[in-house]
Amino acid sequence: MKPLFVLPVLLSLCSTLYSQNIQFTEYDLPNGLKVLLHEDHSTPIVAVSVMYHVGSKNEKPDRTGFAHFFEHLLFEGSKNIKRGEFDDYVNEAGGYNNANTWYDRTYYYEVLPSNQLALGLWLESERMLHANVETVGIETQRQVVKEERRQRVDNQPYGRILEEAMKRTFTTHPYHHSVIGAMEHLDAAEEADYKQFYKDFYRPDNAIISIAGDIDIEQTKKLIDVYFKDIPRGQGEIFRPKITEPPLSAELRDTVYDNVQLPALVCTYRIPAQGTKDFYAVKMLSMLLSQGQSSRLQKQIVDEEQKAIAVGSFPLELEDPGANIMFAIANMGVDISDLANSMDAVVADVQKNLVSESEFQKIQNQVENDFVTANNTMAGIAESLANYEMYFGDANLINTELERYRKVTREDLKRVANQYFNKNNRVFLYWLPKPSQP
């Protein structure tokens, strides 16, 4: 009886925790830098982060990979930081740092003891204003990025799934090319190309600084003025591609041969941009299909039919209309056509029948739990605030977006399954071992 008692208590606690709004202060500097500050004295740490509104989407077609390349290059040092010492400052202060790049944005952060707030601000101001964009660092990071691509994409089984799926799903929109980009583009680029990219996008009016943790708001404002106020606003318009991808009119099927032992299936469905009403329904539908051991794909295809060893479905959370990736890796000896039929059958069931009340409630609980988990650290809060501000211009969605999920109904799941997860709206890839190639 004990687990039955504990579960509702935990769910209630999660709901209570999330009902406590995350308070924050927001304002703009005269140079266009958006500032978001969250004060929390529960632990003596602070997360200092800067999000730039630039990703692979903003790259030139013959210079792909620049956004991700800069994620590496901007740890090379600056006018006042020697090469290789950026990380040393953070490590010696007892903190850690990292960065990541996506189709729409690039994100840098440090998590430090709260008495090192000024250090984090200085490091990020150096990155914004004085970064070393020169031949030595460029050549060093070219080799680093090439090795990363070899390890994570080219030589990783199934490592090219996202790349191959997206380049077929999008033909005109820059989501067509991968975030890591083409190595020949990085090789062909000259120092002037990199300097121009830095000038075009690494500017205060294209950035959000988000700080969460053991801070004093007024003192933090003064420190931000010291390190960022005098950085000049960028010149010229920031390049934002405005491209509408034509709709798919029929299913596109293709075959990819890879160095894998087991074949796989990859289905990419076109979906709306994140933040739209239907996106929330699509995300919950994807959770129904693949999140957890009791999800539809897992139960039917992996556990009951034993046709696959791994399954998944996830929407890409993008600024423009994007894609939902669904995949299954076949079990040994399973005919790939049988696996495809089983995947389609799982989707067809959601298209024909309403999800049960109990199953729908479980998804709602998962959504709430995911929200609590995403924002239970200072680093998580800083990133969430920055994401909401960048994608939607509304950082307060950290407190209100959950209501958008709560408005989704069982009927919405059935509707979006038919509208977006239909065969005429997808790219279907057979992922086969290389020896099978004729």
Regions found by a protein language model. Name each.
Residues 3-14:
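Sec-dependent N-terminal signal peptides
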Residues 17-19:
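Boundary at the C-terminal end of the N-terminal hydrophobic targeting segment
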Residues 150, 167, 236-294:
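His/Glu-based metal-binding/catalytic segments typifying zinc-dependent metallopeptidases
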